[in-house]
Amino acid sequence: VLPQGRFNNTSDKQIREFIAEHCRILAVVGLHGNVFKPHTGIKTSVLLIQKWDEKLCPKIDDYPIFFATMQEKSKDNSGEKIFVRKKDFINSAIIESDVNLVAEPIDHYEANPISLDEYLLDSHGHLIVKHDLFNHDGLTKDGISEAFAEFAKKEKLSFFL
């Protein structure tokens, strides 16, 4: 995880060249600026890399890279987590014992739960933070993680064979 400037600044060209020389860049995922709030509001990116290796990852010059940007902010501007509410799933009948009936969520959320009865809980009874990084227990939409897994399979990356 690096501040986004490290990937863009001309003064950091040496870092980019070092990474490209020693690793295959698998993915670059831009995180929302609120992810690390309240500690910092600097926009960051996650760089997924695989060290060049003759057997597992032979060096090649031209290859595709997965790019994605987090759209759901997961925290408000003060750094408070935003949780998924039951009423955001209008098209489904949410039953306490069967959370698998949840349909596609609507993208309207509020932070700081008032009553736990209003919020969607995962299979462990925990609140679900709104984000688009991965599908949470099958209760939320597929996210960046699932898209990367499909990319990795399509590209026949060694860790998905």
Regions found by a protein language model. Give the residues of each.
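A conserved structural/catalytic subdomain of Rossmann-like adenosyl-cofactor enzymes
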Residues: 2-161
